[in-house]
Amino acid sequence: MYDLGNIAVMGSGSWATAIAKMLMEKVEHLHWYMRRQDAIDDFKRLEHNPSYLTSVHFDVKRITFYSDINEVVKQCQTLVFVMPSPYLKNHLKKLKQRLHDKFIITAIKGIVPDENLVCSEFFRQVYNVPDENLAVLGGPSHAEEVALGRLTYLTVGCSDQDKARSMAETLVSGYVKTKTSGDVIGIEYASVLKNVYAIAAGICNGLKYGDNFQSVLMSNAVQEMNRFLRAVYPIDRQVYDSVYLGDLLVTGYSNFSRNRVFGTMIGKGYSVKSAQIEMEMIAEGFYGTKCMKDINRMYHVNMPILDAVYNILYERISPAIEIKLLTDSFR
C-alpha cells in the first residue's frame, strides 16, 4: 500500500471542510492550507470553519494550519486541492516548491479558466506532475450531506491504482464508501459537465417546467456527456456509474446544488451578475460553460444543452426562447 505521508487539504470552502471531516476519521493529524490568516485564527478559536459547514466541529489540536502555501507543500506528501477552479492559479502564484514528486489529488469540479484545462492537465502541463502522481476525487457528494454523516459514495481516479487504493481506504468510514478508477480525465470532464447540466435544470425549474421534462433533460444530458467523453478520451467506461450519472443526478436535482440554484435564479429572470451577488458562492458551472464551449470547438461534438446554457449565460439570449428551442430538439 502506498504511503500517503502527511496529507494536506488545500482550500477553505464547504467541500474542503467536508473532506477534512472525512480524513480526520482516519488520520491522526491533518495539515490544512487556508489563504487567510484571520480565517485560521477564527477556526482555532471557534473549533469550526467560521464560514462554511459551521455545525462540523474539529479537534484543532490534531490540525496544523498554514496560510503559507510553500510551507504546507514542504511539509506534506499528499496535497488535496479543494478550491474553486477560477482561483487555483492565483493560489499557486506564490508557490516556489516543486510539485512533481508530490501526490496531487484534485477535488475541484471545474476547469482552469484561460487555460481551458481540467485540473489534472493543468498540474501536468504547468507543474510537470507525472500521471502516476495525479488523482481525482469524484462522485455524488454534497458537502452538506457529508457534514450530516449521510451515506456517500466516492471514487478516486488515478493511473496508479496502488495510490488510488491508499487514498480510497483513507476516506472510508461508517458513512463513506469508496472505490477506484483509472479514468482520471473522464471523471474530471464529467464533473465539469454535470455543473453545466445542473444550471440547465435550474433554468428549466425557474421557467416552471415540471418533473416530466426535467427527466427528459437529464436523460439527454447523460447522452450528451457520453458523446463528449467518448470523443475526448475513448476508453471502455460505464457512464451510468455513480461517478458519472450519479454525480449528474444529485447536482441536477438537489436543493444543495449551487449550480441548480444559480440556474433557477437565471430562469426566474435574474441577470448573471445579480444571481452571483445574491448567492455569495461560486457556481462552478458558470465558468465551466464557457470553457467547455471553447474546448468543444476542437472536438465538434453535438452538445445542444451546453450550447443552450452558453447562449443564455454569455450571449444573453432569453432563457424562455433558448429552452423552447432545446425542447423542440428533444425526442
Predicted stretch roles:
Residues 201-205, 230-331:
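NAD(P)-dependent Rossmann-like dehydrogenase/reductase catalytic/cofactor-binding core
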Residues 74-75, 193, 245:
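Alpha-helix C-terminal capping/helix-to-coil transition sites in glycosyltransferase folds
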Residues 1-56, 63-67:
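NAD(P)+-binding Rossmann beta1-loop-alpha1 motif at the extreme N-terminus of oxidoreductases
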Residues 66-74, 78-149, 167-169:
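Rossmann-like NAD(P)(H) cofactor-binding subdomain of soluble oxidoreductases
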